């Protein structure tokens, strides 16, 4: 076996140091056996020293350091005398120590191991480590008094794979992380020097935090090739009535600009409700004392940034498990009281986990070391000075309420934002949350599903306790006794209460369902509206349905009479005048009121009869006025220029001469403008920042900016990806994909799926025919309402037929 290599023999329980230095003092019959209790990362290190202080065993002739991890055999002999002499070991060994009854001081000089003569009685307070590289080692050691000293390594807990390359001694780095359960057991690494070849070079720094938790693992794919798995189980109490203590080492990222990132967080005896308490057996009593510890330190590698330990590759659950056992609780408590006065609570660190730090940008205030180098100091203390930190439970973040709705900001007056509630599915905005909630019923497929589902029925809930109570109700009833059956799904229940609850689930599911009419394409989210539609349109009392508007009638004659409204047909004509009507009853009323014998006065021109002479005189004025104003675009004639102008503007032009001063909206007639201005009274106007457009409604202003001043097309069709500026344009476009017949106007961009609406559009907008004509002056109108308004204004003395 070479001098600079270790031979790993996992099946060998004991390891002996056979090689004896020339200056070593021999003791007949005595032999040192070392048992190490955690995985050790070993590499070739030159000129590194480890000093362990204040080790005074009860029996100086017997020292046992136990371990239950790996079988490592180092064939070197170490001789001992009544007083430990200096021994040379030609191997690179790092052995962290744990002190139970007393402090331990040991100095290991690499490539040789030296134990000074006065190490047992001295009280040395400083040690030095010289390590150019870094190795993470989670160690836990305890010393037992036996006659023979054996170095034993077991692999019952952690399987460690150690790869040592003798040809590349500068690649694998070493650094020791010791989890020591003794109150004052501190490996002081203030003398550790880290060689920095370039001060301006950024370094990889990380926190290592140890906390008590379940077993875990470390997987490292770096040059060291180390894999540690700690998922196997361990007996919490050993044979000698001591219980081990499990400590985890977590890695936290640090700021590379800090000089000293080492530190300690100590947690005193945990409360009963703490889940991370570890029971330690007090040697003076049989009571188990639960305690907790968290330890962190830094890993600073300035020489091997790319080849050495790559902390960014380590997952969030990475840790090293340290087992600590056989500790004197009384000595620990006494030492903790002394050490409590020495701890500076102001030097406490804050930790940032890897999952929260995407880069090495987390600042942490470090403690300046004595020699200015990065500190590898690791403390595990039982003091209560920082105990209140552990008792402060972190505040739980409140889970966002599922009933909360997201808000958005739109442009308001003078650039001030206005909060609205947008629909995240179709983009429509609402002024209040209630309107948005009502609108969301139109998107039942996108409503949030409940988190917890019952496996026995359709019950769902967002609360875990509600599901638990519901499952308990299932346990009270036997499935064999279920006799009541649900009419909708066929499930059986034992009593009516369970069936009622089950039907509420069906009702809840149906609340978000779109209700579609069976006889036409009408659909709505509310059942009441569908019932009203069925009663008014498709009821058995109204079996005769109009194909144009869907209105129902009791008799075919009523439907035939109704269809004349859509066709404009007027088959009934007055025999005394040119009056025509679509309904015979209207014609009878006309004759009775206009051509009755009870009205002796009759017009000589139109043969209309009147009961009073004044009425006849006013009527004759209509015939006397000469209509000299002829429209250039049609056959319309007006008695004055104002009427002709009004006709041309409203019929033959798209200009709107009457403009609103507030919003610049145009109208054909002054009366329409007057009605519009009344809307603006008492409302604050919102000015567009890009033009002079003003509007009282901020939603209209938002649509104006999207349609006029932006080139973006935020509303896109999911099928053909065509973009639109406004939601209503997209809605019209979606009708082309629905499979329904679309009526497209050949004169403009108007389109609709309603045949009657399309017909009204063509007649009222793009034709010169005006089917609704005045009986007195033969003036035509697009709609009957316009004709009635005309008669009330100009033929008030005659009255409506």
UniProtKB/Swiss-Prot annotation:
Locations listed in the record: Nucleus
This protein's UniProt keywords: Activator, DNA-binding, Metal-binding, Nucleus, Phosphoprotein, Repeat, Transcription, Transcription regulation, Zinc, Zinc-finger
Gene3D superfamilies found in the cross-reference section: Classic Zinc Finger (3.30.160.60)
One of the Pfam families matching this protein, by short name: zf-H2C2_5
Record has Repeat as a keyword: yes
Top-level taxon in the UniProt lineage: Eukaryota
Protein family per UniProt: Belongs to the krueppel C2H2-type zinc-finger protein family. ZFX/ZFY subfamily.
Comment, domains: The binding of ZFY to DNA is mediated by the interaction of the GGCC core base pairs with zinc fingers 12 and 13.
Protein name: Zinc finger Y-chromosomal protein
Species name: Pan troglodytes (Chimpanzee)
């Amino acid at each position: 076996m070479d001098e600079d290599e270790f031979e790993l023999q996992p099946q060998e329980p004991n390891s002996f140091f056979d090689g004896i230095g020339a200056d070593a003092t021999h003791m007949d019959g005595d032999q040192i056996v070392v048992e190490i209790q955690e995985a050790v990362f070993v590499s070739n290190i030159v000129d590194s020293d480890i000093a362990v202080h204040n080790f005074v065993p009860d029996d100086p002739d017997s020292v046992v350091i136990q371990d239950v991890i790996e079988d490592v055999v180092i064939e070197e002999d170490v001789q001992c005398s009544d007083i430990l002499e200096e021994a040379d070991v030609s191997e690179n060994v790092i052995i962290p120590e744990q002190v139970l009854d007393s402090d331990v001081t040991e100095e290991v000089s690499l490539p040789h191991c030296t134990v000074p003569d006065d190490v047992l009685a001295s009280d040395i307070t400083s040690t030095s480590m010289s390590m150019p590289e870094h190795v993470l080692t989670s160690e836990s050691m305890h010393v037992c008094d036996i006659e023979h000293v054996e170095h034993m390594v077991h692999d019952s807990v952690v399987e460690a794979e150690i790869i040592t390359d003798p040809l590349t001694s500068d690649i694998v780095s070493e650094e020791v992380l010791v989890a020591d359960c003794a109150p004052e057991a501190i490996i002081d690494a203030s003398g550790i020097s880290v060689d920095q070849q370039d001060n301006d070079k950024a370094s990889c720094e990380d926190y290592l935090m140890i906390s008590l938790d379940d077993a875990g693992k470390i997987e490292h794919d770096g040059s060291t090739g180390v894999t540690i798995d700690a998922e196997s189980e361990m007996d919490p109490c050993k044979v000698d009535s001591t219980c081990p203590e499990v400590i985890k080492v977590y890695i936290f990222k640090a700021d590379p600009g800090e000089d000293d990132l080492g530190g300690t967080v100590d947690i005193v005896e945990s409360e009963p409700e703490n889940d991370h308490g570890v029971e330690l057996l007090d040697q003076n009593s049989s009571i188990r004392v639960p305690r907790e510890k968290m330890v962190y330190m830094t890993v600073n590698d300035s020489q091997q940034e790319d080849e050495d330990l790559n902390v960014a590759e380590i997952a969030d659950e990475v840790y090293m498990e340290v087992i600590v056992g056989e500790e004197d609780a009384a000595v620990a408590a006494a030492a903790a009281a002394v050490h409590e006065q020495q701890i500076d609570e102001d030097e406490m660190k804050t930790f940032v986990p890897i999952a929260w730090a995407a880069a090495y940008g987390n600042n942490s205030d470090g403690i300046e070391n004595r020699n200015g180098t990065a500190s590898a100091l690791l403390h595990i203390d039982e003091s209560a000075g920082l105990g209140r930190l552990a008792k402060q439970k972190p505040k739980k973040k409140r889970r966002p309420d599922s009933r909360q709705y997201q808000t958005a900001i739109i442009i308001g007056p003078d650039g001030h934002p206005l909060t609205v509630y947008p629909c995240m599915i179709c983009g429509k905005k609402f002024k209040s949350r209630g309107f948005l909630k009502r609108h969301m019923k139109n998107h039942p497929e996108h409503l949030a599903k409940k988190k917890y589902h019952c496996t026995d029925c359709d019950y769902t809930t967002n609360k875990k306790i509600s599901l638990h109570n519901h499952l308990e109700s299932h346990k009270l009833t036997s499935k064999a006794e279920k006799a009541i059956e649900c009419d909708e799904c066929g499930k059986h229940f034992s009593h009516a209460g369970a069936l009622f609850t089950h039907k509420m689930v069906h009702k809840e599911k149906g609340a978000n369902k779109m209700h579609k009419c069976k006889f036409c394409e009408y659909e709505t989210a509310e059942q009441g509206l569908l019932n009203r539609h069925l009663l008014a349109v498709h009821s058995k009392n109204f079996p005769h349905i109009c194909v144009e508007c869907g209105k129902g009638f009791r008799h075919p004659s009523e439907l035939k009479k109704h269809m004349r409204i859509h066709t404009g047909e007027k088959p009934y004509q007055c025999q005394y005048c040119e009056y025509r009507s679509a309904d015979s009853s209207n014609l009878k009323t006309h004759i009775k009121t206009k051509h009755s014998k009870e009205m002796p006065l009759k017009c000589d021109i139109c043969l209309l009869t009147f009961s009073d002479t004044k009425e006849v005189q006013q009527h004759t004025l209509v015939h006397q006025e000469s209509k000299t104003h002829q429209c250039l675009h049609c056959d319309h004639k007006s008695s004055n220029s104002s009427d002709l102008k009004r006709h041309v503007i409203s019929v033959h032009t798209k200009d709107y001469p009457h403009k609103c001063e507030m919003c610049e909206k145009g109208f054909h007639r002054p009366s329409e403008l007057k009605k519009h201005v009344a809307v603006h009274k008492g409302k604050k106007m919102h000015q567009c920042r890009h033009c002079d457009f003003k509007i009282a409604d901020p939603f209209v202003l938002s649509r104006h900016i999207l349609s006029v001043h932006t080139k973006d097309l935020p509303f896109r069709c999911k099928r053909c990806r065509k973009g639109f500026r406004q939601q209503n344009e997209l809605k019209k476009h979606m009708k082309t994909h629905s499979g329904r017949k679309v009526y497209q106007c050949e004169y403009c961009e108007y389109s609709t799926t309603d045949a009657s609406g399309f017909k009204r559009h063509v007649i009222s907008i793009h034709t010169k025919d005006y089917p609704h004509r005045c009986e007195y002056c033969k003036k035509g109108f697009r709609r009957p309402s316009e004709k009635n308004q005309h008669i009330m204004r100009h033929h008030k003395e005659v009255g409506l037929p």
